[in-house]
Amino acid sequence: MPEGWAVCCLENVAEVLDNLRKPINSNERNSRIANKHESELFPYYGATGQVGFIDDYLIDGKFLLLGEDGAPFLDKYAIKSYPIKGKCWVNNHAHILKPLCDFDYLMYYLNHVDYKDYVNGSTRLKLTQSDMRSIKILLPPLTEQKRISVKIKYLFCLLDTIACHL
């Protein structure tokens, strides 16, 4: 391991804010948004992204969401962690994280973790909060985290450009 790098548990590099989640069933959510204009609604997020809208918000800010159940944990190319920003509602199928390290570095890292030792379940995989907290994160110094994040963003932009020209 390079000098200055450390192996940390996720709970030491991100604040876990699962206490801000509030489950709501689809019938109640649908009744709350009935007859409301889209401008009166807020994004409603689940394990893999936005799953709808709701008439209120529980959090406001920039957060990283990581699937709890229903996420494609064993697909190494699939998104398991994604950014959200602004006023929104997160359901109980996603963990809410506030990174204490470089935001993008942690997001990219969590999308490439091998989750097989962290998830449970036979038909629907679940990442419990305690297992999530124990995920090992290889953490370089902050300047290196930022350099890695910038390079990954550049490479994704390059891929997008190439894909547009195919």
Predicted regions and their residues:
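A common structural junction motif
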Residues: D114-Y118, F156-L158
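Non-catalytic DNA-recognition/assembly elements of restriction-modification systems
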Residues: M1-N30, A34-G46, L139-L166
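Residues that form generic nucleotide/phosphate-binding pockets
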Residues: V13-V16, Y109, Y118
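Short low-complexity linker/loop segments enriched in small residues
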Residues: I135-I137
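A short beta-sheet element
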Residues: G46-Q50, I54-N111, N120-R133
